[in-house]
């Protein structure tokens, strides 16, 4: 993998692969090559345009990003643009069933859970993304081995890396 992407040798539950991606230009690196993953975005989004954030989300959706948790200044906007990218990709189909309108989504991207963690510590948001943010019980995801991808701007990289490599510390600081 390129220098931007580091596969961490971490002891994670269920043998989950853990990738650390440098988010220097807000672009999804093609070399990541994963499907069905949880993403954690730790960034200061104040300098990123709406189009840039939406482009990142749009690039991640075809890789079947199942969950995205955002942390850092202006993380609510990151959350909103991921939601927008999902809702408009692809166009939902509506059908009437048992007297109620239902919406179904493409099997390519059946579900996306998004959260933002404004006002929380980095450790708390990372713990949530790592241990809670996976759509368990959903048939599309039940039998899939999850991958955890942390997309991190340089100022937060070392702390995120250290926490991901030390699950006990992540739990201790994340639950504090």
Place the predicted regions along the sequence by residue.
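ATP-dependent carboxylate-amine ligase
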Residues: 1-176
């Amino acid at each position: 993998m390129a220098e931007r992407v580091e596969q961490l040798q971490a002891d994670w539950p269920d043998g989950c692969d853990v990738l650390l991606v440098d988010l220097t230009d807000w672009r999804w690196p093609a070399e990541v090559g994963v499907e069905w993953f949880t993403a954690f975005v730790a960034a200061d989004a104040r300098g990123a345009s709406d189009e840039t954030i939406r482009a990142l989300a749009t690039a991640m959706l075809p890789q079947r990003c199942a969950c995205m948790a955002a942390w850092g200044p202006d993380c609510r906007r990151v959350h909103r643009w991921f939601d927008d990218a999902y809702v408009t990709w692809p166009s939902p189909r509506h059908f009437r069933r048992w007297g109620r309108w239902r919406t179904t989504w493409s099997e390519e991207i059946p579900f996306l859970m998004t959260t933002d963690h404004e006002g929380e510590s980095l450790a708390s948001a990372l713990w949530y993304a790592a241990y809670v943010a996976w759509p368990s019980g959903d048939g599309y995801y039940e039998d899939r081995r999850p991958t955890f991808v942390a997309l991190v701007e340089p100022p937060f990289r070392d702390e995120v890396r250290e926490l991901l490599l030390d699950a006990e510390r992540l739990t201790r600081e994340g639950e504090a």
